[in-house]
């Protein structure tokens, strides 16, 4: 029995010169468009919008699982023209070169991530990466912006040079097409298609992570303040000034509306990126990572630290409400005290010298509220950073890794040895009732026994999904810009040392305050304060 062939072998439109698809194309396999649970796609080669977007490749894609639903992200505005059912036989407007990139006008329904590359006559929602050179309405695609003025909505990541509404992550740029997703760049206003790179267009755009000053119908994130309607992906909109993207720092000021992760209402030279520093005061509107209600000079990147003060408003990871000299990045410590408002990782209401980043160190103690990363109903001096810990007594409430009911009083010095034993609450690896006395180590004698909570990603961690170590421990100085103060060892793949105390010594052994233990997800304490190899 032959596979069901929905279309006759003859081409309904003589002007399409594309070859017929091979007969065996649909044999067997899911490709057959027969009674698929998701619905049958009328065209076997229709690049239906899939979860990842339309397929741009010349090979047929199985449309069955992806019926053409009308939807914000995956809608098929039109069926293929009869001749365009095979990708190779894309229907081109007369005179267009079939081999031209994006020349084919497939009325392909846009995939989740992107607009179809073919900008042909047929309006099509976006396909994955390609931008269509022709002006056809299409939904934004993943990375590639269409150079032409096509009204298209932003795809997940892609930006369209044309005025289009932003997708979840895709910026819609007005005349300027720029989809700086993660990194930002400063550039001329010329439309430039970019995937992850920064788009230099002057349009302000709001983004998932970045904010867009331009008013635009952004899907997710922030309001557009600028004259240019532009939706932005992860990267911040440059506005009049080209600005740094999500990952990269941008030297110029720009207005940004708050994006999911991005800051938006105030000017900021740079938004803190994972690796970028913010050098100028930034007003951050509420974002995924937190809003900054006060201008702060720098936000630290993942690895970088920012010396100037900044305040943050609550975000999933924890807002900073008080001025602090630096916002911590992944590894960078902040020397200045800043208070943080609640976030998923837990609100910080008190000043602490450094806001903890995922791996940042918190120098000060502050009460921490419940957070997704390990709920602490009782105030305890642990910074809200993912891995950072603050010295001080706190009760630890149940977290992903197990609950610690015991209060851990901490004594003596910023990270000084704590004489009190900490019973370990039951964790994934089981309760550890015994306290661990620690004697002198690189950092000096530490008498503290501390409970170990259930294992984190890399090992036992007192609390938090990533394993927040409540116990103070020295921060290693090193590539990540951790505290130069003495520390027995860096824990974790990146060396998570979350010592929440102000650094004193510049050398690893120079810190006068001996703190008994280096804390970390992997930290198994030995009497001498050393960590296991």
UniProtKB/Swiss-Prot annotation:
Main subcellular location of this protein, as a coarse class: nucleus
Compositionally biased tracts (Polar residues): 379-406
Region Disordered, annotated ranges: 1-37, 67-251, 319-347, 370-434
PTM-bearing positions, type Phosphoserine: 160, 432
Compositionally skewed regions (Basic and acidic residues) per UniProt: 1-12
Compartment(s): Nucleus
Claim: Phosphoprotein is one of the keywords in the record: yes
Family membership noted in the UniProt record: Belongs to the DERPC family.
Protein name stated in the entry: Decreased expression in renal and prostate cancer protein
Originating species: Rattus norvegicus (Rat)
């Amino acid at each position: 029995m032959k596979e069901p062939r929905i279309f006759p072998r003859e081409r309904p439109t003589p002007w399409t010169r594309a070859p017929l698809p091979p007969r065996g194309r649909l044999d067997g396999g899911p490709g057959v468009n027969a009674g698929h649970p998701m619905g049958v796609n009328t065209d076997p080669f229709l690049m239906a919008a899939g979860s990842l977007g339309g397929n741009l490749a010349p090979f047929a894609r199985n449309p069955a699982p992806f019926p053409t639903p009308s939807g914000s992200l995956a809608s098929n505005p039109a069926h293929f023209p009869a001749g365009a059912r095979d990708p190779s036989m894309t229907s081109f407007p007369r005179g267009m070169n079939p081999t031209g990139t994006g020349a084919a006008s497939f009325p392909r329904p846009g995939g989740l991530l992107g607009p179809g590359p073919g900008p042909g006559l047929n309006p099509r929602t976006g396909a994955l990466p390609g931008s269509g050179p022709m002006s056809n309405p299409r939904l934004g695609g993943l990375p590639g912006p269409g150079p032409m003025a096509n009204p298209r909505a932003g795809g997940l990541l892609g930006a369209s040079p044309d005025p289009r509404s932003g997708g979840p992550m895709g910026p819609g740029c007005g005349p300027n097409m720029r989809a700086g997703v993660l990194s930002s760049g400063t550039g001329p206003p010329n439309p430039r298609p970019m995937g992850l790179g920064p788009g230099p267009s002057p349009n302000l755009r709001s983004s998932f992570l970045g904010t867009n000053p331009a008013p635009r119908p952004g899907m997710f994130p922030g309001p557009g303040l600028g004259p240019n309607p532009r939706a932005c992906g992860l990267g911040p909109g440059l506005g009049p000034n080209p600005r740094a993207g999500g990952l990269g720092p941008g030297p110029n000021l720009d207005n940004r509306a708050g994006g999911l992760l991005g800051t938006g209402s105030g000017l900021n030279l740079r938004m803190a990126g994972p690796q970028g520093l913010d050098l100028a005061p930034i007003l951050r509107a509420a974002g995924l990572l937190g809003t900054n209600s006060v201008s702060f000079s720098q936000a630290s990147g993942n690895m970088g630290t920012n010396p100037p003060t900044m305040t943050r408003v609550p975000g999933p990871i924890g807002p900073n409400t008080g001025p602090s000299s630096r916002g911590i990045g992944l590894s960078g410590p902040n020397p200045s005290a800043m208070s943080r408002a609640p976030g998923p990782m837990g609100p910080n209401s008190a000043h602490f010298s450094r806001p903890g980043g995922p791996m940042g160190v918190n120098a000060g103690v502050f009460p921490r509220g419940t957070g997704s990363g390990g709920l602490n109903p009782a105030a305890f001096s642990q910074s809200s950073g993912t891995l950072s810990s603050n010295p001080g007594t706190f009760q630890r409430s149940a977290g992903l890794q197990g609950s610690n009911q015991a209060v851990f009083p901490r004594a003596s010095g910023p990270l000084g040895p704590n004489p009190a034993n900490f019973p370990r609450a039951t964790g994934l690896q089981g309760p550890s009732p015994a306290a661990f006395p620690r004697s002198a180590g690189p950092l000096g004698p530490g008498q503290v026994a501390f409970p170990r909570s259930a294992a984190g990603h890399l090992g036992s961690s007192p609390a938090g999904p990533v394993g927040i170590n409540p116990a103070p421990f020295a921060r290693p100085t090193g590539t990540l810009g951790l505290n130069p103060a003495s520390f027995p060892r860096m824990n974790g793949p990146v060396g998570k040392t979350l010592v929440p105390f102000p650094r004193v010594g510049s050398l690893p052994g120079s810190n006068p305050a001996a703190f008994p233990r280096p804390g970390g997800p992997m930290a198994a304490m030995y009497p001498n304060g050393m960590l296991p190899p």
